[in-house]
Amino acid sequence: MKKIFLLAFIALTIVACERKTATDVVDANTYTIDAQGNMVEGLLKDSLLFATEIDKVLATEQAHCRLVPIFRTRKDSYGNSYSGTVNYYERYAEEGIRFQSGNSWHDNLIAGFKTIYGSEMVNVSLLNLQTKQKKYLFEKPVLIENIYYPAPIRDTLNHKPISRDYYMISCYDEDTDKNGYVNRGDLRRFYLFNTEGDRVKALIPKEYSVVGSDYDGVNDILNVYARLDSNKDGNVDANEPKHIFCVDLKKPENTVLLY
């Protein structure tokens, strides 16, 4: 099933931690040619029609809620269409708290959450099976890095079943460096959504760009690393200050600057 979206902005998706895009085709369209004839990662942020496709329906802890990630379609060098697919971040190594007695995380990176990524994921639709309604979490296409959503199978943390009732999404949604494109050179945002698909808040201030995170299972906290755009040029580099934000996963509205 394909739909046509009005492109407000979109770019090439690569997740925060290093990975390779799972494709064996030669992509002649991953980059846009600018006015000078140079190849630029990402596409013009201005209005442009493009095709999208879905991959699969994702079950969540809330039985009436289903997520449908949406991907931009591309054409290979032979003119055949293809699109990204849902991929999961999982951890199998027997290390740390996840393998202590009373903890069963079903290979999830974070207790109670599935974490997904996919090449050029541009939106996600929330299906409410009770009301038969759907809702796009973003009004316009964005560049999604990853989505954390409540796992359909309950994990246990410190001998207790753990429940999650919200989503967290890391994405690029603005041409912050004003170069005409939305891509990984822009500031990366981190948003909190409720299970109705409403955006609750930005977990990290907009003048920061998320660069990574790690999970503290002892305290059920997500430590988010972000660099401050101190010179206000719309992108960040290694010379700009790196800070740590603590997201209490029991009450994610409470985000504290640790460093």
Identify the meaning behind each predicted range.
Residues F113-Y117, M168-D175, N223-S230:
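Beta-strand C-termini and the immediately following turn/loop, strongest in propeller blades
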Residues P161-I162, T176-R184, D229-A238:
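Acidic, glycine-anchored loop motifs typical of Ca2+
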Residues C17-T21:
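Bacterial signal peptide processing site
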Residues M121-L129, N183-E196, N239-K251:
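Beta-propeller blade signature
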Residues L143-M168, E207-V224, Y259:
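Conserved beta-propeller blade repeats
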Residues T32-W105, Y117, Y148-S163, E174, ...:
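Structural signature of eukaryotic scaffold interfaces centered on beta-propeller domains
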